[in-house]
């Protein structure tokens, strides 16, 4: 399976090769349709045909991602009503219903601090690539009609691990058997992220709010916006330090204000 390269989000009935026509992040119109060109990982592409986003591998295989209209998103969330919100991070998670199905809607609201716009599209690309894994929150589709992409995911009945018990409720400690099950399943998902693709991809933001649980207590890893690929033949990559205080390695997180910090990764299999 190839990883992502030229992500071409094209709202038209015909897939066009925009690689020679656009710069990263450039938006323009042609024939009444809006186009967005975005460059990410190597050897693949994300395109849109007849309302369906497609991630293409170098072998020509496509992974369809459904596109939802802004009307569907606004109706599902009652115009992003806060009473529908079930979690807040760099984005807001809303519980909604689309076509009689409960869904989880991820909306990047406002200007996330120190957040590269590329991360929005990386989240779509990596989430789609990972959605076949049983321990990853399945991406159902997205909406490109807002200033930033809105992601639509499967709805995990028990919610985020960080909020088990709900606001104001007495939270009973999870049984050790459940904790070990969650740890193993997330480890399986991370191992898949590290080893399934031609380049190792590092999540960089593992925390309780990014782990969801379904009705069977099956763990689901989510939120790949901060993920980064390790160049072939390398053990690490230089990038701006990012993550969440309290969940990263202390020395690493203490350098959050550094312009760059060497991220060294060794994958254990």
Curated annotation (Swiss-Prot):
Residues 80-269 form the Protein kinase domain. It catalyses: L-seryl-[protein] + ATP = O-phospho-L-seryl-[protein] + ADP + H(+); L-threonyl-[protein] + ATP = O-phospho-L-threonyl-[protein] + ADP + H(+). GO terms for molecular function: ATP binding; protein serine kinase activity; protein serine/threonine kinase activity; protein tyrosine kinase activity. InterPro entries: Kinase-like_dom_sf (IPR011009), Prot_kinase_dom (IPR000719), Ser-Thr/Tyr_kinase_cat_dom (IPR001245), Ser/Thr_kinase_AS (IPR008271), Tyr_kinase_cat_dom (IPR020635), WAK-like (IPR045274). It is an enzyme of class 2 (transferase). The active site is at 205 (proton acceptor). Keywords: ATP-binding, Kinase, Nucleotide-binding, Transferase. PANTHER family: PROTEIN KINASE SUPERFAMILY PROTEIN-RELATED, WALL-ASSOCIATED RECEPTOR KINASE-LIKE 21. It comes from Arabidopsis thaliana (Mouse-ear cress). Belongs to the protein kinase superfamily. Ser/Thr protein kinase family. ZRK subfamily. Its EC number is 2.7.11.1. This is Serine/threonine-protein kinase ZRK7. GO terms for biological process: cell surface receptor signaling pathway. ATP binds at residues 86-94, 106.
